């Protein structure tokens, strides 16, 4: 009898105040994470875009040659993977093509610039030489940075249909196609909002 009353109360709370039930669920989940937390040594290194780096390289976004040099430096340590959680959605403003478009140059200067390798091309080459992954974000609205990108990883499933339990985005936001085609993988940084602003799960 007691169990039935508790169950009835929970059902009414679920209907009348679903946010309360979710809050209790979040608290329980967080408590379990603290009780059963596993201590692990992390070998992850974060390269932060902070005030010091902005003072050295100038305002963001930086020239893509800066990122090419960063990759060169990182590759000396033979990392297992290099992930970028920023987007490179537009051409580098300091690329030869963009300079030619922006300024009224004499033909000889135009010819000289056209023979130069652009920052995006250099960055793409360095990405190809590295174990690099670039971020992709799921979106519900179309973006100029969208094209018919395909996943680089293979997906295997067993049992039911996983698409019935995963959140699907109609569009995606990422980087220039030239850059994405030269990385080893595309990593999703999509997340679903929760009531308290804490990320506990990620949509596949």
Predicted regions and their residues:
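Non-transmembrane functional regions of envelope-associated proteins
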Residues: 3-204
């Amino acid at each position: 009898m007691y169990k039935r009353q508790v169950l009835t109360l929970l059902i009414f709370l679920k209907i009348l105040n679903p946010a309360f039930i979710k809050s209790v669920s979040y608290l329980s989940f967080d408590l379990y994470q603290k009780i059963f937390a596993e201590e692990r040594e992390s070998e992850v290194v974060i390269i932060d875009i902070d005030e010091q780096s902005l003072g050295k390289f100038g305002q963001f976004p930086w020239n893509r040659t800066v990122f090419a040099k960063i990759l060169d430096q990182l590759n000396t340590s033979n990392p297992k993977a290099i992930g970028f959680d920023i987007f490179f959605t537009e051409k580098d403003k300091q690329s030869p093509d963009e300079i030619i478009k922006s300024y009224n140059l004499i033909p000889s200067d135009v010819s000289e610039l056209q023979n130069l390798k652009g920052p995006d091309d250099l960055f793409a080459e360095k990405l190809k030489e590295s174990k690099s992954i670039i971020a992709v974000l799921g979106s519900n609205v179309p973006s100029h940075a969208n094209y018919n990108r395909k996943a680089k990883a293979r997906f295997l499933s067993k049992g039911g249909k996983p698409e019935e339990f995963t959140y699907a985005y109609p569009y995606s936001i990422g980087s220039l196609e030239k850059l994405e085609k030269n990385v080893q993988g595309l990593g999703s940084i999509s997340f679903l909002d929760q009531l308290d602003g804490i990320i506990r799960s990620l949509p596949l």
